[in-house]
Amino acid sequence: MEQEQDTPWTRSIEHINTQRRGNGQQTPKLEHPNSIQLMDHYPRITSRADMHKQIVCWKQWLSSKNPTQGSLKTHVLKRWKLFSKQEWTN
């Protein structure tokens, strides 16, 4: 079996640098957090913020007096178009 050569390419894939402890030993340390965890965390943050904005908007609308069927339909269509546009740009 061939041994994997230590090249700049393989080192960059591993994202490892060394850090000295107080006793002089070197330990490998990850340079960056796991990118999969980062990508998993980011949508959760943005979706919570978007959800909060939508809830606030609907509460404001519902607090208006005596909404009619027509105003409800108009409001829903405007919100849907805005939401769809944001989804495409993200």
Curated annotation (Swiss-Prot):
The keyword Membrane applies. It is found in: Host mitochondrion inner membrane; Host nucleus; Host cytoplasm, Host cytosol. One of its GO terms (biological process) is symbiont-mediated perturbation of host apoptosis. Keywords: Apoptosis, Host cytoplasm, Host membrane, Host mitochondrion, Host mitochondrion inner membrane, Host nucleus, Host-virus interaction, Inhibition of host innate immune response by virus, Inhibition of host MAVS by virus, Inhibition of host RLR pathway by virus, Membrane, Modulation of host cell apoptosis by virus, Viral immunoevasion. InterPro entries: Flu_proapoptotic_PB1-F2 (IPR021045). Residues 1-34 are annotated as: Disordered. Its main location: host cell. The keyword Membrane applies. GO terms for cellular component: host cell cytosol; host cell mitochondrial inner membrane; host cell nucleus; membrane. Residues 65-87 are annotated as: Mitochondrial targeting sequence. Residues 1-28 have a biased composition (Polar residues). The record marks N66 as: Low pathogenicity. Plays an important role in promoting lung pathology in both primary viral infection and secondary bacterial infection. Promotes alteration of mitochondrial morphology, dissipation of mitochondrial membrane potential, and cell death. Alternatively, inhibits the production of interferon in the infected cell at the level of host mitochondrial antiviral signaling MAVS. Its level of expression differs greatly depending on which cell type is infected, in a manner that is independent of the levels of expression of other viral proteins. Monocytic cells are more affected than epithelial cells. Is not encoded in all strains, and seems to be dispensable for replication. Belongs to the influenza viruses PB1-F2 family. Oligomer. Interacts with human SLC25A6/ANT3 and VDAC1. Interacts with host MAVS. This is Protein PB1-F2. The lineage of its organism: Viruses, Riboviria, Orthornavirae, Negarnaviricota, Polyploviricotina. The gene is PB1.
